[in-house]
From Swiss-Prot:
Species this chain originates from: Halalkalibacterium halodurans (strain ATCC BAA-125 / DSM 18197 / FERM 7344 / JCM 9153 / C-125)
Pathway terms, separated by semicolons: Amino-acid biosynthesis; L-arginine biosynthesis; N(2)-acetyl-L-ornithine from L-glutamate: step 3/4
Name by which UniProt lists this protein: N-acetyl-gamma-glutamyl-phosphate reductase
Family in the record: Belongs to the NAGSA dehydrogenase family. Type 1 subfamily.
Catalytic function, reaction form: N-acetyl-L-glutamate 5-semialdehyde + phosphate + NADP(+) = N-acetyl-L-glutamyl 5-phosphate + NADPH + H(+)
Length: 345
């Protein structure tokens, strides 16, 4: 199959190129850009130099339809909301890595993103692509709203608890840390080397755009879930997310039962690994991979469950999960093109 990447010059688009280049069922990758049409992508990014000349093409829905079967949209907020309706009318499958189609209610999207929402019909036609929990829906979908990086780590960590109603749904606290690539490619003061090196900072306190996405999906599993406390931090590394999640148990449970339940739930999920007693994941253990590693513990003294969930924000949190969804949409093995081990050290 031939695939297109709109927004190929950002970190998410570049990661799509890296991973799709290794996919045995992808015969050609065509890259599109709104501002750099005609430029050789491998001149901008020498790591892409090799046998293929990655020349950027203009974004034109009719031309894209003539080129490819599936389009990955790795675009800034607002772009895919405008582009997706035209692509869908032309019969293309669309996997959107932006936040434009993740929030079901337009007024909620507009309140958090401070921009006009996509057409309601497009939003409602999109399937939220948290692969481990939406396989059947994804297999039948034409449009995938690929989850955000933080929500991926958080939701995979919380799903086994929320679905079983084992925790107080009104008192969920999420403390998350991310590498600087999560802030995107465009330079800013917050990601400037002199500001970030040997530093650790909280940002978008009580205002992170991924908050309503997390709450929406949690409420799909348990409508009694309240507003979550969600804190995000930047740490001086390039890749990786660690979400440490705290919740109060609402029934008697042992740590052994917790771990066994997590392991059972994710037994058929090739990219999710649940750690054994006394072990907790580190971001380096998933670096460059589509994996999510999870550790869970229960503190009898405080009656709190702690879940630690780590992913690579550019892979499982973006491009890798998008390709995982692409595989499911097309009836391929879920792991196709994503089998590589994490980079270590």
């Amino acid at each position: 199959m031939k695939v297109g990447i709109v927004g190929a010059t950002g970190y998410g688009g570049l990661e799509l190129i890296r991973l799709l280049s290794q996919h045995p069922n992808v015969e050609e990758i065509i890259c599109y850009s709104s501002s750099q049409e005609g430029l050789p992508l491998d001149d901008m990014y020498p790591h892409l130099s090799g046998n293929v000349r990655w020349t950027l093409k203009a974004i034109d829905p009719e031309a894209i339809r003539a080129d490819v079967d599936t389009v990955f949209l790795a675009t800034p907020p607002g772009v895919s909301g405008e582009l997706t309706p035209d692509l869908v009318k032309l019969g293309l499958k669309v996997i959107d890595l932006s936040g434009d189609l993740r929030i079901n209610e337009p007024d909620v999207y507009e309140a958090w993103y401070k921009r006009q929402a996509a057409p309601v019909g497009t939003i409602r036609g999109a399937v939220y692509g948290l692969t481990e929990w939406q396989r059947d829906e994804i297999a039948a979908a034409q449009i995938i709203a690929n989850p955000g990086c933080y929500p991926t780590a958080v939701l995979l960590g919380l799903a086994p608890l929320v679905q079983q109603k084992w925790i107080d749904p009104k008192r969920i606290i999420i403390d998350a840390k991310s590498g600087t690539s999560g802030a995107g490619r465009n330079p800013s003061q917050i990601t400037h080397f002199s500001e970030m090196n040997e530093n650790f900072k909280i940002y978008q306190v009580n205002q992170h755009k991924h908050t309503p996405e997390i709450e929406q999906q949690l409420r799909n599993w348990d409508e009694s879930v309240g507003n979550v406390t969600f804190s995000t931090h930047l740490v001086p590394m390039v890749r990786g997310i660690m979400a440490t999640i705290y919740a109060e148990a609402n029934q008697a449970i042992s740590e052994k039962e917790l771990r066994e339940h997590f392991a059972y739930v994710y037994e058929t999920s090739p990219f999710v690994h649940v750690y054994s007693e006394g072990r907790y994941p580190a971001t380096k253990e998933v670096f460059g991979s589509n994996r999510c590693h999870i550790g869970v513990t229960y503190d009898e003294r405080t009656n709190r469950i702690t879940v630690v969930s780590v992913i690579d924000n550019l892979v499982k949190g973006a491009a890798g999960q998008a390709i995982q969804n692409y595989n499911v949409m097309n009836g391929y093995e879920e792991t196709l093109g994503l089998e590589g081990s994490p980079l270590y050290p």
